[in-house]
């Protein structure tokens, strides 16, 4: 893991899905970013169904729409707070995509909610926070 300096936080990765815990994670990350002058990358993952059916296709579309809405809301909050932010939408397994993106951007901190939406709307599930924290060498803040 590369860092911008000993204990410095310059770039924060925040996983979002629109759940109450995710919104709290966004707000906490924005407060941290504002205090230390860091930028934020918001990621939302549209989880794809493994079973190719008409119902699964509708669920995939709904999952992607929720992911886009969560990213839009997060960006609005960042703009209101005056924090530089970018958004990225990925498709696939949430934990794997979050860890993969973290490896690409090398954040100083990853922030995510302890639990997320479930079912077709589940871009980030509760087990995702555990999987991310176990699968990466970056600092992880899990918000309840």
Positions of PLM-derived features:
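Gly/Ser-rich helix-loop-strand patches that form or flank binding pockets
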Residues: 1-4, 100-144
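Conserved beta-strand positions in the Rossmann-like core of class I SAM-dependent methyltransferases
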Residues: 41, 86, 141
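Short glycine/serine/threonine/alanine-rich loop segments
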Residues: 38-39, 83, 107, 138
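Amphipathic, non-transmembrane alpha-helical secondary structure
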Residues: 23-30, 34, 72, 95, ...
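A short acidic, glycine-rich active-site loop
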Residues: 58-69
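Structural beta-alpha unit
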Residues: 1-7, 76-110
């Amino acid at each position: 893991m590369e860092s911008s300096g000993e204990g410095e936080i310059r770039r924060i990765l925040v996983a979002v899905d629109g759940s109450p815990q995710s919104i709290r994670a966004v707000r906490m990350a924005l407060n941290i970013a504002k205090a230390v002058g860091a930028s934020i990358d918001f990621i939302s993952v549209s989880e794809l169904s493994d079973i190719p059916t008409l119902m699964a296709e509708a669920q995939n579309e709904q999952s992607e729409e929720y992911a886009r809405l969560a990213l839009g809301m997060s960006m609005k909050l960042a703009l209101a707070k005056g924090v530089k932010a970018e958004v990225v939408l990925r498709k696939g397994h949430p934990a794997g995509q979050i860890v993969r993106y973290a490896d690409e951007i090398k954040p100083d901190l990853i922030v995510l909610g302890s639990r997320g939406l479930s079912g077709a709307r589940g871009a980030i599930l509760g087990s995702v926070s555990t999987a991310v924290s176990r699968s990466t060498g970056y600092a992880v803040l899990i918000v309840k």
